[in-house]
């Protein structure tokens, strides 16, 4: 007689598997943080810069249009001004229907500072509301100037009347009064911009050891003793690349001084020659070919242009040189008068 024995259960089948669910803290998305901080506009609301008339204005739309297609990836900071005449009451030069659009942008979006100035003449239709971004009827806008900020001096001339003074390298001076429709915040933006262009940012401080000619931006005012100490401290801590730039700038300055000295020496020789010819025609006079010239420009053959003047520099450049590097869009810029810079 066979007895049935129940099968024994395996030891591993008696284990129970427990599913552990780990909980991670949930963070809001980046857009949610930006909306909370007010850095990005909420859906349905306009960009604060657009509402103030400093972004995506008429000047930006014109330079980004297919007709011009200038700096398509760069942001344009702009405002509308009224050109005035210097006097107690700042009288307007043109009619109220004529305004001046003034803006700054960067030739390359990655630059830490703007390096291009844009000016355009705007003529509004009679009775038209001067809205900056999307006017119902497009006004007549004429691009007047595109200038590197290297060749422009921008000053706050009258903060009470919100007047800027603009001087170009051709000594053309404009007095521009911020349009009354712009709020006071916009003028504070221009004050901040002028301060940045004059003094630079913490990452784009202007190196006084770098000689950049034809720059109308005034240097920082400081005592002679403090300036000398500052330059000496910077010279001690210069890196190899900065030392090379410093030597190049110093050598160019010394070369210019030597050229002026040689010209003065030639002038003295010529005056003596004329005096001797008048007194006696028999005496031998030194010829101009024998005039000594101690100027040596061989070192310029290897460095035709400084690191901040090269159009396509090799290798990454320091941020402190990017502003002047981009301002010099070409090694030599020909002006209307025919001079080369």
From Swiss-Prot:
Disruption phenotype: Mutant males are sterile. Spermatozoa from mutant mice showed abnormal head shapes with an abnormal swollen acrosome morphology and impaired acrosome reaction. Expressed in testis (at protein level). It holds the Pfam family GARIL_Rab2_bd. GO terms for cellular component: Golgi apparatus. It comes from the Eukaryota. Keywords: Golgi apparatus. It is found in: Golgi apparatus. InterPro entries: GARIL-like_Rab2B-bd. GO terms for biological process: acrosome assembly; acrosome reaction. RAB2B effector protein required for accurate acrosome formation and normal male fertility. In complex with RAB2A/RAB2B, seems to suppress excessive vesicle trafficking during acrosome formation. Belongs to the GARIN family. This is Golgi-associated RAB2 interactor protein 1B.
